[in-house]
Regions:
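Primary recognition of N-terminal secretory signal peptides and signal-anchoring hydrophobic helices
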Residues: 65-69, 74-76, 87-90, 96, ...
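Ser/Thr-rich low-complexity repeats and stalk/linker segments
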Residues: 1-151
């Protein structure tokens, strides 16, 4: 018998002297002419003691005790949260499992130390499914999954009176007009900033209207007007859109934040930094 199994039905085999009778847990076993015997036992969950007794024609008997453990419970699997993932192609995933289990993560063997498993996996932008399969010593298996999101980050830097912006540290083509401050608000070219954030910009020449669309967000504004509509809701901004050197400029914080970006201002360098994490 195996010392540990997940199969309740087990065959017990052995050999005794020819002519002996054998019982296994008081149930008669089949004994061949050469003394080999076999019988079937049904195990209960946990530790089982099997009593094999052989008796000769004179009535003398010999007993042997064999122990085996039945474990039919699949191993629990825990997957740790790897945290917020940005611009990564490879990550280490970790978790816990029943000690001495064999673990695979997305088909690759994981390292298991006592009850801690870990593995390095490849990831892509967007949703990634981590599939963990664990097989314990008894042969029971279990599967757990966890969806992870990997974001792409865009960082835009614009400096007041400097026409050269940067995106993720790379200088871009000079703008027709540099960012400037109006009414205490930093004004930036709407088309550049919107498209850099992944939005679509439409210009209506007759009404001087601007429509910015990003996913489910639609921002509508008009040159010279402090009223802005965001998904049909009206807002009032401090500085209206203006046209400078043939380009439309808008207050950066209002637009960026409604497009899901974070805006930071460095007074010492007069630089505005716009950061947006998104799923490509």
């Amino acid at each position: 018998l195996p010392p540990l199994t997940n199969k309740p039905q087990q065959e017990v085999t052995g050999r005794t002297n020819p002519g002996n009778t054998v019982t296994i847990n008081d149930a008669p076993a089949q004994v061949a002419q050469d003394g080999s015997f076999k019988g079937t036992v049904t195990l209960k969950e946990g530790l089982n003691t099997i009593i094999v007794e052989a008796k000769n024609a004179a009535g003398l008997s010999t007993r042997k005790l064999v122990t085996t453990t039945l474990d039919t419970t699949p191993p629990n699997i825990f997957i740790d949260d790897p945290g917020y993932l940005v611009d990564v192609t490879e990550i280490e995933v970790t978790g816990r499992v029943e000690p001495k289990s064999k673990v695979t993560v997305n088909g690759q063997p994981a390292t298991v130390t006592h009850d801690i498993w870990k593995a390095v996996i490849k990831v892509n932008y967007g949703k990634n499914t981590v599939t963990v399969i664990a097989i314990d010593q008894a042969g029971n298996s279990n599967t757990a999954t966890k969806d992870l999101l990997v974001y792409k980050r865009v960082i835009i830097n614009l400096t007041i009176d400097n026409p050269v912006p940067t995106i993720n540290g790379e200088p871009q083509a000079p703008l027709e007009a540099a960012p400037f401050i109006s009414g205490g608000r930093t004004m930036v070219p709407i088309r550049f900033i919107s498209e850099a954030l992944g939005a679509e910009v439409k210009w209506e020449e007759i009404t001087k209207g601007i429509t910015i669309t990003l996913g489910d967000t639609v921002i509508a504004m008009q040159v010279g007007s402090t009223t802005v509509m965001v998904n049909g809701k009206s807002y009032t901004i401090d500085a209206p859109p203006v046209i400078k050197n043939g380009r439309t400029f808008v207050p950066i914080r209002f637009i960026s934040e409604h497009l899901g970006a974070k805006v930071d201002w460095d007074e010492s360098t007069r630089t505005v930094t716009i950061t947006r994490d998104f799923i490509p």
